[in-house]
Amino acid sequence: MMDLQGQFLIAMPQLEDYFQNTVVYICEHNEQGSMGLVINQPTDLSIAELYSKMNFMMKNDRTFSNELVLAGGPVHSERGFILHKKAAKEFEHSYKITDEMFLTTSADIVETFGSEDAPEKYLVALGCASWTAGQLEQEIADNAWLVAPASDTILFETIYEDRYPAANQLLGINPHNFVFSQVGHS
């Protein structure tokens, strides 16, 4: 079985609809299937707005970046997923992806946003992408996705519209050079 957990999936140009030009960070990959977050489709909702909509008592000492909440995928689109670096504090519903990367789905992490208890680096997504057992491997075999090692720089520092070309660059690919015909297939 491929080890895809903690890797990027990069959509091939022929992939259309929801996943066109997307980069997905794979949070979980096992015999039951796979789950990941699209990291380059921002919504128009900022993390600060999300925080206030969740009715937390806004504290004056909180400072928020103007980062946007991501559209993480078409599944559970009303549910929040926070991808973050290891934090000093443990959160109620956290899943270890790698030694340094975690996925948290409990509201206790949101309560830390803008404070010193927050993870140093994090992104917030509504919804996720999921695949049944063997489905993702088949899509990769069918050339729907490229697999690349994940990059913290792309995850947390690269602006949204540059994440797709930056992920392709990890593999030495310029997405503008893709040939759209399937060479060798008749």
Model regions: which residues?
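A short aromatic-anchored loop/beta-hairpin motif
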Residues: M1-V124, A129-S186
